[in-house]
C-alpha cells in the first residue's frame, strides 16, 4: 500500500491527523509532520519509538496536530527525531520478511505463470467480524472469474486481468470456498506486537485451510498442479477491512503475501502448504462496499514473482520520481478507480514474470 494520511477520531471527540507508513513487513504511524506515534488501549495516540529489539516504547505525552500542541509537547519534540532511523526500518523489514516468508528473503514465486491454472481461494470470518456482503462465495467467484465483470463499476474480473496482461499465456481459474469461521477474534491474527510484522497472521491461513479441509470443502491435492507435494498457492479473503487502508482498525490484518514453510499444521491431505496471499473483504475503512480486483492482483503479483515498487520505509512518503506511482499495480496502481481498474503490468514487470522478452537497444 502507499503511505496515506487520514483523520482519526479520539475518545473525547477530537481528531488527530495521522500518517501510515510502510508495508506488511514493517509499518508505523506518525503525526502529519513526521513524529512517530502509537495508540494505547485508552484510545489516544502517544509519541513513541521502537527499541533496538523492535518492541514499541511509549512516552506519556499525548499527540496533537501541530497547531494544537501543548508546551510540553513542543519542548519534547524539539529534541526528538522524526520517523524511524533507516537502520531500524531496514533491520525490521528484514526480520518481518524472515518471519512472514519463513526465512526466505527472496521474492516468492508459487505459481508457474503459464497455461490454465486452478488457484484455491478461501473466505474466512473471525469470531467477532463476519462477512458483510450478501452471498460472499458467489460474489467473490464472480469478481475473480466472470469475463467482463462489471458489478459496482468494475471493468473486468481478476481472470480477465491476468489473461490480458499475459497475452493469453496465463489463464487462472479461482476456486472459491467458504466462508469458514476461524477460532479466534480478528485482533488475535492482526495484532502488531513488534515493529516487524503481525506474528499471528500466518496462523490465520493455517486455521482457514484446516477448517476448510475438516468441512470437506477442498481436497488440497487438487491444487498441486506439478505433483511436487506442495500446494501451488492459497489465497484467503478475510472478513472486514485491511489495516493498510487509511483509517482501518489497527488490529485488522494487513494484506500480504508470504509462506507457511516450517509452520505446525501446514501438511493437509498429504501435501504441504507453502506460498499464500491474503486481503480483505471490504474496501476503505468504513462502509460495506466489497473490494475491487486491485489488491488481489497486487498480492497475486507477488505470487508470480514480482516485488513491491512503492516506498516501503516511508521516510520520504513514497513521493520519489523514480517510482511508478499509479502506472504500476505493484506501486499505487492497485487503487486506480477505487481498486476496480488496476493498470496493465509494466514492461519491467512482464519481463520479470517471463511474459515478455525485452529488446536490448544497441
Regions found by a protein language model. Name each.
Residues 1-271, 275:
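Zymogen propeptides/activation segments of proteases
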Residues 233-235, 239-362:
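Extracellular hydrolytic enzyme modules, especially secreted metalloproteases
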Amino acid at each position: 500500500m502507499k503511505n496515506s494520511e487520514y483523520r482519526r477520531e479520539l475518545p473525547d471527540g477530537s481528531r488527530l491527523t495521522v500518517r501510515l507508513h510502510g508495508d506488511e513487513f514493517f509499518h508505523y504511524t506518525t503525526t502529519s509532520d513526521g513524529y512517530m506515534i502509537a495508540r494505547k488501549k485508552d484510545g489516544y495516540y502517544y509519541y513513541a519509538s521502537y527499541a533496538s529489539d523492535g518492541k514499541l516504547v511509549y512516552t506519556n505525552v499525548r499527540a496533537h496536530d501541530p497547531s494544537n500542541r501543548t508546551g510540553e509537547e513542543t519542548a519534547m519534540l524539539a529534541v526528538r527525531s522524526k520517523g524511524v532511523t533507516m537502520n531500524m526500518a531496514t533491520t525490521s523489514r528484514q526480520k518481518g520478511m524472515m518471519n512472514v516468508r519463513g526465512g526466505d528473503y527472496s521474492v516468492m514465486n508459487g505459481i508457474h505463470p503459464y497455461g490454465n491454472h486452478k488457484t484455491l481461494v478461501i473466505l474466512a470470518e473471525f469470531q467477532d467480524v463476519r462477512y458483510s456482503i450478501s452471498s460472499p462465495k458467489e460474489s467473490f467467484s464472480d469478481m475473480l472469474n466472470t469475463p467482463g465483470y462489471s458489478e459496482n463499476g468494475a471493468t473486468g474480473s481478476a481472470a480477465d486481468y491476468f489473461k490480458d496482461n499475459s497475452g493469453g499465456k496465463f489463464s487462472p481459474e479461482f476456486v472459491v470456498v467458504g466462508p469458514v469461521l476461524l477460532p479466534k477474534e480478528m485482533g488475535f491474527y492482526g495484532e502488531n506486537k513488534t515493529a516487524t510484522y503481525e506474528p499471528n497472521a500466518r496462523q490465520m491461513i493455517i486455521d482457514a485451510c484446516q477448517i476448510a479441509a475438516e468441512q470437506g470443502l477442498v481436497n488440497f491435492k487438487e491444487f498441486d498442479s506439478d505433483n511436487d507435494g506442495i500446494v501451488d498457492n492459497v489465497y484467503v479473503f478475510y472478513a472486514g477491512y485491511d489495516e493498510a487502508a487509511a483509517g482501518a482498525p489497527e488490529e485488522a490484518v494487513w494484506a500480504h503475501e508470504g509462506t507457511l514453510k516450517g509452520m505446525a499444521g501446514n501438511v493437509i491431505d498429504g501435501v504441504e502448504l507453502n506460498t499464500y496471499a491474503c486481503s480483505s473483504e471490504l474496501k476503505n475503512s468504513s462502509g460495506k462496499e466489497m473490494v475491487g480486483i486491485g489488491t488481489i492482483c497486487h498480492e497475486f503479483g507477488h505470487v508470480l514473482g514480482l516485488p513491491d515498487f512503492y516506498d516501503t520505509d516511508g521516510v520520504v512518503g513514497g513521493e520519489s520520481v523514480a517510482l511508478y506511482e499509479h502506472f504500476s499495480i505493484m506501486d499505487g496502481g492497485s487503487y486506480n478507480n477505487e481498486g476496480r481498474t488496476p493498470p496493465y503490468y509494466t514492461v519491467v514487470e512482464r519481463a520479470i514474470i517471463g511474459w515478455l522478452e525485452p529488446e536490448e537497444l544497441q
